[in-house]
Amino acid sequence: MEKKTGTTTVGIRTKEGVVLAADTQASLDHMVETLNIRKILPITDRIAITTAGSVGDVQALARMLEAEARYYQFTWGRPMTAKAMAHLLSNILNENKWFPYMVQIIIGGYVEEPTLANLDPLGGLIFDDYTATGSGSPFAIAVLEDGFRKDMSLEEAKELAVRAVRTAGKRDVYTGDRKVQVVVISKDGMKEEFVEFKE
């Protein structure tokens, strides 16, 4: 019997930075395992990834990216950009296409400029202003498409990202709607917060 898991993660890029948001519910088949899991992982102090798919695969890829970022910094004396990291991850995923990592990842960061990318399990790479992954992504992307503006502030983008994840949580049984993890990355660094809802 195939076990079903799910989540919703979103990313929004503005002129000021990048907002990543995700629900905090971990589910397995029809059971909620926890309501308090982090699905946005920092890779450097300026780049983070969202996780949708196999937890073990995501953790292995995150460790690889952390090591590559440290090696790049040591070798070249400057941080790896989010764009370079997205291309690196795309290559890693594509090299393993016969035994794929079962993940869908959003990379967001601000090193030289705000960058947002979406990667599929085979290494397909799309840079965009907004994106969503996971089982609730059809609901989240509708909210993002309706509310996104190129001139949004980071605060407006944060509110939109939370609304997109929360909307997905109300319609997708595998996405939680009680708490949303939010990471904002700007030229000033990375900030994480959790937005909780009582209802």
From Swiss-Prot:
Biological-process GO terms, alphabetical: proteasome-mediated ubiquitin-dependent protein catabolic process
GO molecular function: endopeptidase activity; threonine-type endopeptidase activity
Signal peptide per UniProt: none
Annotated control of activity: The formation of the proteasomal ATPase PAN-20S proteasome complex, via the docking of the C-termini of PAN into the intersubunit pockets in the alpha-rings, triggers opening of the gate for substrate entry. Interconversion between the open-gate and close-gate conformations leads to a dynamic regulation of the 20S proteasome proteolysis activity.
Record's keyword annotation contains tRNA processing: no
PROSITE patterns: PROTEASOME_BETA_2
Pfam families cross-referenced by the UniProt entry: Proteasome
Reactions it catalyzes: Cleavage of peptide bonds with very broad specificity
Removed propeptide positions: 1-6
Function noted in UniProt: Component of the proteasome core, a large protease complex with broad specificity involved in protein degradation.
Matches recorded under NCBIfam families: arc_protsome_B
Protein name: Proteasome subunit beta 2
Species in which this protein is naturally found: Thermococcus kodakarensis (strain ATCC BAA-918 / JCM 12380 / KOD1) (Pyrococcus kodakaraensis (strain KOD1))
